[in-house]
Structure formats: structure tokens, C-alpha cells
Amino acid sequence: MLAALNLGGGTEKVMPKEIDVSRMDVDYTSTLASEIIKAKLKAHGGHITVYTARGLPCEIYAESDGTTFTSDKLPVKPAYDYKVFDDIVELLIKQGGRAKKGNGRNYKLGEPGCEENTVVGTIALHRGRTIGESVFDPVFVMAAILEWAGIAENGRGELI
């Protein structure tokens, strides 16, 4: 019964998914966050492990289309495109290098805590959400990727 519930403590290893990075076109001379992250992800074979501000691991995978990525912590479709990082960096620049992460779990887009000038609000707008809509909050993963790439610091409650 424990085996059926996956509670038996078995030693089976989960094989990582096979990733084809050959279709990932990267501009290695670009200063855009999207291109920097794509280049680093491609250099790592299309799979990395990043860590949240709390130290929890997140698996990141390049998708075969060469323009999007997924994570074991982001169960949403369609996959996120790399350009979301350009929007986040643009927000950081507009706000003098600091931006509140915001909260998409408890608030709808545009409500206090989930405003357009927060990281979660910026991501929601990038995904085509409109004011008043519920949003998925992927900031913990996006912030971890930005920190891994050396683009921003994943601070408590804010990106720096």
C-alpha cells in the first residue's frame, strides 16, 4: 500500500526530461535580461536549479520552441517566455532599482498589493491579464532566476 501511495521511501530516481537546446537562438552580445538568461540556460544544457529566497529549489527547463521556459513550480500554460524578464528589469529601472514583489495570491490585478507597479503586476500584464482579474503569482521563481543570472537581488518582499 505504501508503494501505491508513493510513501514507501523507494530509491527510484526521477530522470530529468530530455532538453533540446539546438533551437534556442541567443544573442550573446545583448544586454537584455531575456538574452542573458537564455544564454546561461543554454550553457547549462537547458536545465538549472535555482533557489527561492527561502532556500527552496526550483527546477527550470528550456522548452524545445527556443523561446519559453517552464518550472516544476509554475504549473501554468502556456509556458513563460523569456521576454518577461525584460519587463521586470524595465520596472526595476523605472523605480530606481527596487520593486516590490507584490502578492497575486490574495489580490486581483490592480488591487493594493497587486498593483501594476509590482513585480507580480508586471508579470500579469505581460501575460495579458487585465485590471480586476485573478493572477497566478510566479514571482518567487522569476526572482530566483534573476538572482541566479546575476541580474537582480532576490530580497525579502522586493527585487533589488
Regions found by a protein language model. Name each.
Residues 69-71, 105-109, 124, 138-139:
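Long Lys/Arg-rich low-complexity intrinsically disordered regions in nucleic-acid-associated proteins
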Residues 97-114:
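An alpha-helical, amphipathic repeat domain used for nucleic-acid recognition
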Residues 1-14:
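N-terminal amphipathic/basic-hydrophobic helices that include classical n-h-c signal peptides
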Residues 147-158:
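A short, conserved structural fragment
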Residues 132-148:
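Short amphipathic alpha-helical interaction segments
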Residues 30-101:
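Long, low-complexity, charged/polar intrinsically disordered regions in eukaryotic proteins
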